[in-house]
Amino acid sequence: MSLANLRTHYTAEVKPESVDNGQKITLAGWIHEVRDLGGICFVVLRDREGKAQVTLVKKKIDKELFDAARRLIRESVISVTGSVKFEEKAPNGYELLPEEIKVLNVAGSPLPMDTTGKVEAELDTRLDSRFIDLRRAETTAVFKIRHEALQAIREYFVKNKFIETATPKVVATATEGGTALFPITYFDREAFLNQSPQLFKQILMGGGFDRVFEIGPIFRAEEHDTRRHLNEATSIDVEVSFADHFDVMEILENLVAHIYTRVIENCKASLEILGVELKVPKTPFLKLTYDEVIEIVNSRCEEKMHWGDDLGTLGEHTVGNYVYETTGESHYFIIDWPTEIKPFYAMPYEDRPEFSKSFDMMHRTMELSSGAQRIHISELLKSRIESQGLNPDGFEFYLKAFEYGMPPHAGWGMGCERFVMTMLGTENIRDTVLFPRDRRRLSP
């Protein structure tokens, strides 16, 4: 028997415009629920696309088939062949009248957690039994939307003449200095998991690639234990030659609007499952200077922000609420950050070097992206590396690219999980990644 015979349709594909009433089809999936009412038995089959009701009337079908259906165990895997009967009251608007039910695998009992939504489970319980949690409609919906967002990102970049790249994740030195690195043994040497593709993106600008993007993992050995931090995340990175920070901000805000548009158009069922209503953010996004942000925070908070401070969680919420109250929008930029609190490669303004040509793209609740025009002048770059207490010798492979014709360039990086989290309003970032890695979780 060919496994292809185990399914002819997904549950959501059975519609009057594509399937005839009475047509024989085969569905395959998991047993979501069995309801035995004596003379009639309902088996709810669930697959990736939704649910279908299999209806067995005792007087109308083979007794052996009816009795077997009553004994089915939830979450077992089955394949059901039968005829379609369109029925408005049934899930998805039809029911399947079975001729054959094949049990492909029997689920153990009791289940480690409920999949129907009748019994809530804590996040740690769900993650410990992720194989079951992924069967929940709400969990599936999040990852369908994440998939659509990533497809939209690639579509946008390809349309705008970007080249997709893949840079090393095992490196000999820190991308941005600091100690937030995971050391590994690389044969007889120490190496690290990469924090960011930043240095390699810039080398590609020197190589003439002009416009690049990457979607890939990054690793941060930070001991944060919050609802919005991960130690392994997916970063969406961009670098553009012959561009400044305003140019790449425009690319970023248009990308955000494009993602929202695609998700709204193509993920209606998943959004409905999650109870989320989206609107496309208006562009261009509001731009606030760092100095303006200080004024907003200090006018609304008892705890004052001083020049040179980073924007903490309270400040992010304060400014985010201000922007939402004044514009009705959740996304905005903070520009012109102090040079000393940005990475060494951020370009200072020529006429006021204490400020950098840098930005953060913010959501009402948190930072989503950081970017800047980069330093493309070799001597200035070396000076900035030294000013941050780093040794230029450790960046020789990177600095060499700036000695032989590096164009002006700019770029940014954005966390995929944070983006999905803020778009869907999920409470915890771990809900937006299949198998999260944080300081306490290394399995599954």
Curated annotation (Swiss-Prot):
Residues 198-201 are annotated as: Aspartate. One of its GO terms (molecular function) is aspartate-tRNA ligase activity. Mg(2+) 3 binds at residue 367. The keyword Protein biosynthesis applies. It catalyses: tRNA(Asx) + L-aspartate + ATP = L-aspartyl-tRNA(Asx) + AMP + diphosphate. It is found in: Cytoplasm. Its cofactor is Mg(2+). The record marks 91 as: Important for tRNA non-discrimination. SUPFAM superfamilies: Class II aaRS and biotin synthetases, Nucleic acid-binding proteins. It is an enzyme of class 6 (ligase). InterPro entries: Aa-tRNA-synt_II, aa-tRNA-synth_II, aa-tRNA-synth_II/BPL/LPL, Asp-tRNA_synthase_2, Asp/Asn-tRNA-synth_IIb, NA-bd_OB-fold, NA-bd_OB_tRNA. Aspartyl-tRNA synthetase with relaxed tRNA specificity since it is able to aspartylate not only its cognate tRNA(Asp) but also tRNA(Asn). Reaction proceeds in two steps: L-aspartate is first activated by ATP to form Asp-AMP and then transferred to the acceptor end of tRNA(Asp/Asn). Belongs to the class-II aminoacyl-tRNA synthetase family. Type 2 subfamily. Homodimer. This is Aspartate--tRNA(Asp/Asn) ligase.
